[in-house]
Amino acid sequence: MPFFVVKRDLPGVTPEILQSAAVRAKSCCAEMTGEGQPVRWVRSFYLPETAQTHCYFEAASKSAVEEANQRANIPFTQIVEVMEMTPEMV
């Protein structure tokens, strides 16, 4: 399945808000997967200097990732398909 990055601008976000969003994202992905539309939240990185997060998902489509984030009520500015590269792959 393809990978996607979800970019977010979250000025004023707190660790508690991030934790709550993570719980909702995990729950909504599990819910959608149970409904036959697999979405997997892989990981997120918070960039404190810019108050942004980059959240990585694996799903069949961009629209599935968008739906998971909407269900979780987590705002986003952009969703982009990405290509995974790791040191082990080269």
For the regions a language model picked out, list residue spans one by one.
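Short S/T/G/P-rich N-terminal loop/turn motif that feeds into the first structured element of a domain
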Residues: M1-T33, L47, K62, E84-V90
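Residue-level signal for beta-strand positions within conserved beta-sheet cores that form or flank
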Residues: P2, Q37, P75
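Conserved hydrophobic/aromatic beta-strand scaffold that supports enzyme active sites
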Residues: V5, H54-Y56
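Short amphipathic alpha-helical patches
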Residues: C29, Q52, T77-I79, E88-M89
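A short linear hydrophobic-aromatic micro-motif
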Residues: P38-S44, Q78
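Amphipathic, hydrophobic secondary-structure cores in small proteins
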Residues: V42, Y46-H54
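An amphipathic, aromatic/His-enriched active-site/gating alpha helix that lines ligand/cofactor pockets
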Residues: E58-M85
